[in-house]
């Protein structure tokens, strides 16, 4: 590639010098540069192609990430600095795409980056949501959901002339396709994220300040929102319509491209492999069978055999509520043809395996999507060693007994290019100086461990944390209106709001810490506890947890005895951009889900990679982090997954009995303290109090005492900064296992077999 001269580009595009350009015009200049460089990259073009189908792709802003992958980041940054410009300020003009919500979508984005970086032929396939999940706003210490209008001026979407017809039960719709380029780091080639949209979509269905809309107008609303509210029958139907629209387009695209590459479709499995990312794309199985039989004259039995050899399924959850189940009658309404094929597949599964526990359609005429994936896919993987073992031993045990050869573990990973180079350039520079630059492509950080007792390296590592905290404080002041003390310990829990992730347990700790400070026990360093995450609009208790956190934040800020020592912040509309500011600044990584409930987690990996110490239960990938760094470099607490499973199995967990312990009762009852209730919403606080006291399904009260003790030990250990930074270095040095390049290599070697 020719050398870049931003000065020449500025003169050509705007007739002025680079120094004279404002940040907005420089942003436009950089977008054009990246587009041209990316357009010049040919597509990966192997015989066999991966289609990674996912309801979510939480891709984040792409300008800096793509410059890193295209190999022009340092050159561009240096020229901008020389001209008096700040790339981070320029990036603020980029709007973050709203195509995902949490870990599922961010994992998919990291995977696409790694697939391209390894030079593999593989595209992501999903939907182009006009308003995303929603934009989160806070008012009256409560979450308000408004449309996330991100599509206005989008420079990353490239129109594709492909269009398909999707036939529903009593009407049809037409799709249109847009692509996002995915260049590979250090590669001359690229892949794409293929996003299907509804040609007839009508944004006018959505009032400006509400996410409520007419769910019955399927031909106009299908691609408006990610995960539309499914708390009523029409919402559940809309979800099914949306999922079928996604997979029908994906299947038609896959077949067309396979034929273009030379397939006669009898050999389709030699040309295409599908990775189903969670159960949302499951209907691609019957849809591929339908297309092969009705459009391409392949016999049904052969079509089933073909599809069985080309579809793989990733399970992301242990929660029964998240293993999708749909009424057969609803599927029949959306697509009678697909429902008929599902009935036939169920008959095949029942003929092969009589155990009713593994039926696709149960005695209540409910279709279990994961069961279809397992019977008619050739691979099933979990996403952390513990998660996969739980699937094999308990949650999916009947299937594991039938198909042990199908099951494997593929521990999740993250792309180091974004989460070090992009998010924490000071740390990237330190790593380059100390261990060389190969870590960007190899993911190998292990050489850093040789410097665990090197005073100079530890001091430089501490300096990178100081710099990251300064960037985070600036972000919080400008974007969130919050001032964070420069000497604060930064304690962070950022993830989707859900009872199993136990934000409510951290809230109980905050109450304990507040009361402890009121009693005169002042910490040596102020502690800032940062939350971030959205609650599903229909998930009442999660909304109540947000309200408790925001009310605690206000209560503590207004108490002059406590405010100098304890601060609670909840980031409004937490997204990838916020993550890139907060994660590098964190001292403590809160990974406190109830053991056995978190499949893997990826924020735990990002925090570890950036030198935060993990405070965790032995759940998901936390188990693997603990094994890698050793007990002395991580802080674990809580009941084990086996203990938790036993409590569920015998029904012996008694929240009410634990509540009666004086120390616990004090914390829970603080929520309904009359003065505190007067600050918040009485109904929300009373409901959450009663739920924790009487139900506590995810056992916050089981672990709260040990959690408080362990957390206080973490805060005490922070005071020995030499020992703390040594632990941080050991964590970074052992994070290489969690490179998504490693994960994708494993997927390819053991599942996809792409050349």
Regions found by a protein language model. Give the residues of each.
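A conserved ligand/cofactor-binding region detector
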Residues: 1-755
């Amino acid at each position: 590639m020719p050398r870049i001269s931003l000065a020449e580009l500025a003169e050509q595009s705007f007739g002025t010098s680079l120094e004279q350009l404002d940040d907005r015009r420089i942003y436009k200049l950089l977008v054009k540069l990246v587009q041209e460089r990316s357009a010049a990259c040919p597509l990966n073009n192997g015989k066999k192609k991966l289609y990674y189908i996912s309801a979510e792709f939480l891709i984040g802003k792409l300008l800096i990430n793509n410059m890193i992958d295209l190999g022009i980041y340092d050159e561009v940054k240096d020229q901008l600095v020389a001209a008096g410009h700040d790339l981070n300020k320029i990036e603020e003009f980029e709007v973050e795409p709203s195509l995902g919500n949490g870990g599922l979508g961010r994992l998919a984005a990291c995977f696409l980056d790694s697939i391209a970086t390894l030079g593999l032929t593989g595209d992501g396939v999903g939907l182009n949501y006009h308003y995303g999940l929603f934009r989160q706003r806070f008012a009256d210490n409560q979450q308000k959901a408004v449309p996330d209008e991100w599509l206005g001026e989008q420079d990353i979407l490239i129109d594709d002339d492909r269009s398909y017809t999707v036939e529903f039960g009593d009407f049809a719709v037409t799709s249109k396709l847009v692509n996002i380029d995915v260049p590979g780091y250090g590669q001359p080639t690229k892949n794409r994220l293929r996003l299907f949209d509804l040609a007839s979509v009508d944004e006018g269905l959505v009032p400006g300040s509400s996410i409520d809309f007419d769910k019955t107008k399927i031909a106009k609303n299908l691609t408006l929102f990610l995960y539309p509210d499914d708390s009523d029958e029409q919402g559940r139907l809309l979800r099914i319509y949306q999922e079928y629209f996604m997979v029908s387009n994906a299947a038609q695209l896959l077949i067309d491209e396979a034929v273009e590459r030379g397939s006669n479709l009898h050999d389709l499995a030699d040309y295409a492999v599908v990775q189903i990312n969670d159960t949302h794309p499951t209907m691609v199985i019957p849809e591929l069978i339908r297309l092969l039989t009705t459009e391409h004259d392949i016999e049904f039995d052969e079509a089933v055999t073909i599809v069985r050899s080309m579809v793989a399924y990733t399970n992301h959850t242990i929660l029964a509520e998240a293993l999708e189940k749909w009424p057969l009658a609803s599927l029949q309404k959306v697509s009678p043809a697909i429902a008929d094929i599902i009935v036939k597949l169920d008959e095949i599964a029942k003929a092969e395996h009589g155990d009713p526990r593994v039926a696709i359609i149960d005695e209540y005429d409910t279709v279990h999507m994961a069961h279809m994936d397992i019977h008619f896919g050739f691979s099933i993987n979990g996403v952390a060693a513990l998660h996969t073992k739980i699937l094999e031993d308990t949650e999916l045990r009947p299937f594991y007994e039938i198909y042990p050869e199908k099951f494997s573990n593929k521990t999740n990973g993250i792309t180091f290019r974004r989460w070090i180079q992009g998010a924490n350039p000071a740390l990237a520079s330190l790593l380059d100086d100390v261990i060389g630059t190969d870590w960007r492509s190899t993911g190998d950080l292990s050489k850093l461990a040789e410097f665990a007792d090197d005073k100079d390296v530890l001091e430089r590592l501490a300096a990178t944390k100081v710099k990251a905290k300064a960037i985070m404080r600036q972000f919080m002041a400008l974007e969130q209106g919050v001032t964070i003390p420069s000497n604060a310990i930064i304690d962070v829990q950022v993830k989707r709001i859900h009872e199993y992730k136990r934000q409510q347990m951290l809230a109980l700790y905050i109450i304990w810490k507040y009361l402890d400070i009121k009693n005169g026990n002042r910490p040596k360093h102020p502690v800032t506890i940062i939350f971030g995450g959205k609650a599903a609009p229909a998930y009442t208790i999660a909304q109540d947890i947000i309200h408790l956190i925001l009310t605690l934040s206000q209560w503590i800020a207004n108490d002059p005895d406590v405010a100098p020592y304890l601060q609670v912040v909840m980031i409004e509309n937490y997204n990838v951009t916020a993550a890139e500011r907060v994660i590098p600044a964190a001292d403590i990584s809160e990974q406190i889900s109830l053991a056995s409930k978190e499949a893997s987690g990826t924020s735990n990996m990002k925090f570890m990679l950036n030198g935060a110490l993990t405070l965790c239960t032995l759940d998901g990938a936390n188990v693997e982090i603990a094994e890698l760094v050793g007990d002395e470099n991580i802080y674990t607490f809580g009941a084990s997954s086996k203990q938790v499973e036993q409590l569920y199995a015998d029904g012996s967990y008694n929240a009410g009995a634990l509540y009666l312990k004086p120390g616990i009762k004090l914390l829970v009852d603080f929520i309904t303290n009359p003065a505190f209730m007067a600050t918040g919403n009485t109904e929300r606080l009373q409901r959450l109090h009663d739920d924790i006291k009487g139900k506590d399904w995810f056992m916050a009260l089981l672990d709260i005492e040990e959690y408080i003790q362990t957390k206080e030990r973490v805060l005490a250990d922070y005071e020995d900064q030499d020992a703390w930074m040594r632990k941080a270095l050991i964590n970074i040095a052992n994070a290489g296992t969690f490179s998504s390049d490693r994960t994708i290599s494993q997927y390819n070697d053991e599942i996809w077999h792409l050349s």
